[in-house]
């Protein structure tokens, strides 16, 4: 299932947040969205996920989600959103219970997604017994349990230390190489964007417009072999971001 964003625009009161956003999210690709603070990245993700409706334009789902998909569009947040009184397995089972799946069928799905996220040994652990990285793995496992057509990821690694963030990026890449999932990934971290994105969408200062779309042609499984190329792409992205930030500062100075 592909996603097509057509002429998305939105205001909150007198503040124009997004303007004229056209974007294709192709099945099997990770599309990263970056931009200055306040440019509308998370707002755009909420429109993709159907949590809000834009004032202008539309988000179209092209094609059908997988036949076994319980929820075509599924969120992963930066704050994990785990219930503290439920174990890792219990937090995953919550989304299955919402769809009436219990018993042996639920246990089979839970065992599968915990294994895929390297959490089999922590099935019965409570969130307070898990590190930040493990908590985010539980959140990823929970999202995978509903077999989504597209993962919507809102700065999922921003609450983690740099070492844990690197390990989680490796895990996400390994998972993608096995499953070829689709993701729309909002981040402020340029290193993340060039490490895991097939393309990077750069939004301008508010109102957020698409300043550039950078295609990263190096296969994900070979990114570590091309560190210098990725650093060059990261510098290019930073130059674009810096120009937008400086322009925003100048606009404030001129007021």
Region annotations inferred by a language model:
Residues 34-36:
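The feature captures the beta-strand-to-loop junction immediately N-terminal to the Walker
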Residues 145-149:
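A short, proline-enriched helix->beta-strand linker immediately N-terminal to the Walker B motif
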Residues 49:
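Helix-to-loop junction immediately C-terminal to a conserved catalytic motif
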């Amino acid at each position: 299932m592909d996603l097509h964003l057509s002429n998305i625009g939105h205001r909150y009161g007198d503040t124009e947040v997004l303007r004229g956003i056209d974007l294709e999210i192709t099945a099997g690709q990770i599309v990263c969205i970056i931009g200055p603070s306040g440019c509308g990245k998370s707002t755009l993700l909420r429109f993709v996920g159907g949590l809000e409706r834009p004032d202008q334009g539309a988000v179209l789902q092209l094609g059908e989600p997988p036949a076994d998909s319980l929820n075509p569009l599924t969120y992963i947040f930066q704050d994990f959103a785990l219930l503290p009184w439920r174990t890792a397995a219990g937090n995953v089972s919550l989304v299955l219970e919402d769809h009436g799946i219990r018993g042996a069928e639920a246990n089979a799905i839970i065992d599968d997604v915990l294994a895929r996220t390297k959490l089999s040994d922590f099935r019965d652990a409570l969130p307070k017994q898990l590190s930040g990285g493990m908590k985010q793995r539980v959140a990823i496992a929970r999202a995978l349990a509903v077999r989504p057509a597209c993962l919507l990821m809102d700065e999922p690694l921003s609450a983690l230390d740099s070492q844990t963030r690197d390990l989680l990026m490796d895990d996400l890449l390994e998972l993608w190489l096995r499953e070829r999932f689709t993701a729309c990934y909002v981040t402020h971290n340029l290193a993340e964007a060039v490490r895991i994105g097939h393309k990077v969408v750069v939004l301008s200062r508010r109102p957020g417009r698409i300043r550039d779309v950078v295609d990263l042609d190096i296969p994900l499984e070979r990114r570590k072999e091309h560190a210098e190329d990725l650093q060059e792409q990261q510098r290019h992205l930073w130059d674009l971001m810096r120009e937008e930030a400086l322009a925003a500062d100048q606009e404030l100075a001129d007021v």
